[in-house]
Amino acid sequence: MDESSIIPAEKVAGAEKKELQGLLKTAVQSVDWTYSVFWQFCPQQRVLVWGNGYYNGAIKTRKTTQPAEVTAEEAALERSQQLRELYETLLAGESTSEARACTALSPEDLTETEWFYLMCVSFSFPPPSGMPGKAYARRKHVWLSGANEVDSKTFSRAILAKSAKIQTVVCIPMLDGVVELGTTKKVREDVEFVELTKSFFYDHCKTNPKPALSEHSTYEVHEEAEDEEEVEEEMTMSEEMRLGSPDDEDVSNQNLHSDLHIESTHTLDTHMDMMNLMEEGGNYSQTVTTLLMSHPTSLLSDSVSTSSYIQSSFATWRVENGKEHQQVKTAPSSQWVLKQMIFRVPFLHDNTKDKRLPREDLSHVVAERRRREKLNEKFITLRSMVPFVTKMDKVSILGDTIAYVNHLRKRVHELENTHHEQQHKRTRTCKRKTSEEVEVSIIENDVLLEMRCEYRDGLLLDILQVLHELGIETTAVHTSVNDHDFEAEIRAKVRGKKASIAEVKRAIHQVIIHDTNL
């Protein structure tokens, strides 16, 4: 995408706060996404910071000052304002103050997606770092699907996204900022979507915008004709600045970040107990609340008590502009807490923390990670073996596996019973066949029938009935039963048509076979 196709976003940045928020609201509601943010580029610090935003996601607890019913749009707009107010309250360490309004939000009132939106305020991105910084530097939109599945190197807010289930994030560059939209749905990259989002800001651009600064900026700007000229501002940091002296005049942005990195790393070593609050995929809101609220007094008191030595971790800035200087106001306590929140929480997930551990502890951590990886692989294998899985979490996989194993056990028991029954029938049939003996002799009109088979009730009567049907009249019968074996000797006379020996045997066998089938 060439630079000529990029919307002149400095017009948007120069619009009033409400108008900018209205544009963000229109853009995010038109696509039904969760939130929208405008990252404003600060030329003095060379960094993208929070400019404005609009939250369009789920709400856990609603608090409003309106006595009557409000529309959904009004409620969402008020929610975005309340989230920003809560962030400022937490930043100032006044979350427990009795002076707060009854309608003000508390950390426990927020959903995970609201926490994601709230914590975005604390982030900043020097181009080309982070998604917004990359989009701004490349002058091309950046689309990320599966933001909750990547690591922190790919997406710096990946831990937040995983907790809030933010799956898709897109950053669209403007000349003085970046528009970011996010959703809990997984959406494929769509160029028409990007063009549609740009159109909302393009259609509302003003031709003569007023100069504006982002909400993060604290510069006092003199309204002079020199404001329209482009001035290259060089800022350097002395060694005293890195030690915390507030008297330096020239500050380097790069060395400032290095200082914050060193100090936040040192602070981590003195607060190692807070690392346990932040496990992969854990509840991020609890961590941030603990960071800002669990020791607010000590944090602020430490900052104030050391003011004689270090007034603020963000030292006084003096920007050279010709012969004049514009001095920046500082807020030692608020900026100190903000710095702790910005730099301390990401380092809780930084892999470099393992380098500070003893060798034995490091080996234990590596072994534990490998054990978890193997356990996850086993769960994946187990999931592939179970034909039906209700959900993809470990508890559901185990539950479905147990149910499937019980089903297999029941099926095996049924098959074993069926096999035993069939085997018993085969054995019984073979026994009957081997024990069946029928001998028939017919001499003139005298008939002698000798037979042996398995006994059953009514067997003798059935045999006599068959002989009668063949025209053979029984004259004498001798029978015996021994261990379910039936033996009989029948003498008879042929009356009428003489039946053959084969016909008599066949008839007797039919009677016995009929008994076997029963």
From Swiss-Prot:
Position of the signal peptide: none
Pfam families tied to this protein: bHLH-MYC_N, bHLH-TF_ACT-like_plant, HLH
Keyword Transcription regulation: yes
Main location, first listed in the record: nucleus
Any one cellular-component term (Gene Ontology): nucleus
Coiled-coil ranges from the UniProt annotation: 220-240, 405-428
Keyword Transport attributed: no
GO biological process: flavonoid biosynthetic process; jasmonic acid mediated signaling pathway; positive regulation of anthocyanin biosynthetic process; regulation of flavonoid biosynthetic process; regulation of proanthocyanidin biosynthetic process; seed coat development; seed development; trichome differentiation
bHLH domain segment(s): 359-408
Job description of the protein: Transcription activator, when associated with MYB75/PAP1 or MYB90/PAP2. Involved in the control of flavonoid pigmentation. Plays a key role in regulating leucoanthocyanidin reductase (BANYULS) and dihydroflavonol-4-reductase (DFR). Not required for leucoanthocyanidin dioxygenase (LDOX) expression.
Subunit structure: Homodimer. Interacts with MYB4, MYB5, MYB6, MYB82, MYB113, MYB114, MYB75/PAP1, MYB90/PAP2, and TT2.
Protein name (database record): Transcription factor TT8
Record gene name: TT8
